[in-house]
Amino acid sequence: METLGALLVLEFLLLSPVEAQQATEHRLKPWLVGLAAVVGFLFIVYLVLLANRLWCSKARAEDEEETTFRMESNLYQDQSEDKREKKEAKEKEEKRKKEKKTAKEGESNLGLDLEEKEPGDHERAKSTVM
Protein backbone atom coordinates (compact mmCIF):
# COMPACT_ATOMS: atom_id res chain seq x y z
CA MET A 1 0.00 0.00 0.00
CA GLU A 2 2.86 2.36 0.73
CA THR A 3 4.18 2.02 -2.82
CA LEU A 4 0.74 2.78 -4.26
CA GLY A 5 0.46 5.90 -2.11
CA ALA A 6 3.94 7.01 -3.09
CA LEU A 7 3.12 6.56 -6.78
CA LEU A 8 -0.04 8.63 -6.46
CA VAL A 9 1.82 11.47 -4.74
CA LEU A 10 4.52 11.45 -7.43
CA GLU A 11 1.87 11.45 -10.14
CA PHE A 12 0.13 14.52 -8.74
CA LEU A 13 3.41 16.34 -8.30
CA LEU A 14 4.64 15.60 -11.82
CA LEU A 15 1.39 16.02 -13.73
CA SER A 16 0.52 19.49 -12.50
CA PRO A 17 3.72 21.15 -13.82
CA VAL A 18 3.41 19.33 -17.12
CA GLU A 19 -0.06 20.67 -17.72
CA ALA A 20 1.03 24.18 -16.84
CA GLN A 21 3.77 24.31 -19.46
CA GLN A 22 2.90 26.24 -22.57
CA ALA A 23 5.32 25.34 -25.31
CA THR A 24 4.82 25.60 -29.01
CA GLU A 25 3.41 22.43 -30.45
CA HIS A 26 5.86 20.45 -32.50
CA ARG A 27 4.04 17.84 -34.53
CA LEU A 28 5.77 15.12 -36.45
CA LYS A 29 5.21 14.70 -40.14
CA PRO A 30 2.67 11.99 -41.06
CA TRP A 31 5.24 9.74 -42.71
CA LEU A 32 7.41 9.92 -39.59
CA VAL A 33 4.45 8.98 -37.39
CA GLY A 34 3.76 5.96 -39.62
CA LEU A 35 7.41 4.96 -39.57
CA ALA A 36 7.50 5.18 -35.77
CA ALA A 37 4.34 3.05 -35.55
CA VAL A 38 5.81 0.36 -37.81
CA VAL A 39 9.11 0.31 -35.90
CA GLY A 40 7.24 0.08 -32.60
CA PHE A 41 5.09 -2.77 -33.89
CA LEU A 42 8.11 -4.70 -35.17
CA PHE A 43 9.87 -4.22 -31.84
CA ILE A 44 6.87 -5.62 -29.98
CA VAL A 45 6.73 -8.61 -32.35
CA TYR A 46 10.46 -9.19 -31.77
CA LEU A 47 9.95 -9.21 -28.01
CA VAL A 48 7.02 -11.63 -28.28
CA LEU A 49 9.01 -14.02 -30.49
CA LEU A 50 11.97 -13.82 -28.13
CA ALA A 51 9.74 -14.59 -25.14
CA ASN A 52 8.15 -17.50 -27.02
CA ARG A 53 11.56 -18.93 -27.86
CA LEU A 54 12.72 -18.71 -24.25
CA TRP A 55 9.44 -20.11 -22.94
CA CYS A 56 9.42 -23.14 -25.25
CA SER A 57 13.15 -23.89 -25.18
CA LYS A 58 12.94 -26.13 -22.07
CA ALA A 59 10.32 -28.40 -23.60
CA ARG A 60 12.36 -28.74 -26.77
CA ALA A 61 15.50 -29.68 -24.81
CA GLU A 62 13.54 -32.39 -22.98
CA ASP A 63 12.30 -33.78 -26.31
CA GLU A 64 15.85 -33.95 -27.64
CA GLU A 65 16.99 -35.92 -24.59
CA GLU A 66 14.23 -38.48 -25.13
CA THR A 67 15.15 -38.94 -28.77
CA THR A 68 18.81 -39.46 -27.92
CA PHE A 69 17.86 -42.21 -25.49
CA ARG A 70 15.75 -43.87 -28.15
CA MET A 71 18.41 -43.54 -30.82
CA GLU A 72 21.17 -45.26 -28.85
CA SER A 73 22.15 -48.42 -30.64
CA ASN A 74 22.34 -51.78 -28.97
CA LEU A 75 25.98 -52.62 -28.42
CA TYR A 76 25.30 -56.35 -28.50
CA GLN A 77 23.46 -56.28 -31.81
CA ASP A 78 25.10 -58.30 -34.54
CA GLN A 79 26.63 -56.04 -37.16
CA SER A 80 26.06 -58.64 -39.86
CA GLU A 81 22.30 -58.09 -39.48
CA ASP A 82 22.78 -54.45 -40.36
CA LYS A 83 24.76 -55.36 -43.46
CA ARG A 84 22.14 -57.90 -44.46
CA GLU A 85 19.33 -55.38 -44.00
CA LYS A 86 21.19 -52.81 -46.07
CA LYS A 87 21.76 -55.35 -48.82
CA GLU A 88 18.07 -56.33 -48.85
CA ALA A 89 17.03 -52.70 -48.98
CA LYS A 90 19.41 -52.08 -51.86
CA GLU A 91 18.01 -55.09 -53.75
CA LYS A 92 14.45 -53.86 -53.21
CA GLU A 93 15.42 -50.43 -54.47
CA GLU A 94 17.00 -51.90 -57.61
CA LYS A 95 13.93 -54.07 -58.20
CA ARG A 96 11.64 -51.07 -57.82
CA LYS A 97 13.75 -49.03 -60.26
CA LYS A 98 13.66 -51.89 -62.75
CA GLU A 99 9.86 -52.12 -62.46
CA LYS A 100 9.57 -48.37 -63.02
CA LYS A 101 11.75 -48.61 -66.07
CA THR A 102 9.74 -51.47 -67.56
CA ALA A 103 6.49 -49.64 -66.78
CA LYS A 104 7.74 -46.62 -68.70
CA GLU A 105 8.78 -48.75 -71.63
CA GLY A 106 5.51 -50.69 -71.61
CA GLU A 107 7.07 -54.14 -71.24
CA SER A 108 5.11 -55.35 -68.25
CA ASN A 109 3.90 -58.94 -67.82
CA LEU A 110 1.34 -58.16 -65.14
CA GLY A 111 -1.57 -59.30 -67.31
CA LEU A 112 0.05 -62.67 -67.96
CA ASP A 113 0.82 -63.16 -64.29
CA LEU A 114 -2.81 -62.58 -63.33
CA GLU A 115 -4.06 -65.08 -65.90
CA GLU A 116 -1.65 -67.72 -64.65
CA LYS A 117 -2.48 -67.22 -60.97
CA GLU A 118 -6.28 -67.09 -61.14
CA PRO A 119 -8.16 -69.62 -63.24
CA GLY A 120 -11.06 -68.15 -65.20
CA ASP A 121 -14.74 -68.83 -64.51
CA HIS A 122 -15.03 -71.34 -67.35
CA GLU A 123 -12.14 -73.40 -65.90
CA ARG A 124 -13.83 -73.44 -62.50
CA ALA A 125 -17.04 -74.63 -64.09
CA LYS A 126 -15.21 -77.43 -65.91
CA SER A 127 -13.50 -78.61 -62.75
CA THR A 128 -16.77 -78.70 -60.79
CA VAL A 129 -18.61 -80.69 -63.49
CA MET A 130 -16.01 -83.42 -63.69
Curated annotation (Swiss-Prot):
The chain crosses the membrane at residues 31-51. It comes from the Eukaryota. It is found in: Membrane. Keywords: Membrane, Signal, Transmembrane, Transmembrane helix. Coiled coil: none annotated. It is a single-pass membrane protein. Residues 80-107, 117-130 have a biased composition (Basic and acidic residues). Residues 62-130 are annotated as: Disordered. Residues 1-20 form the signal peptide. Its main location: membrane. Belongs to the PDZK1-interacting protein 1/SMIM24 family. This is Small integral membrane protein 24. The lineage of its organism: Eukaryota, Metazoa, Chordata, Craniata, Vertebrata. The gene is SMIM24.
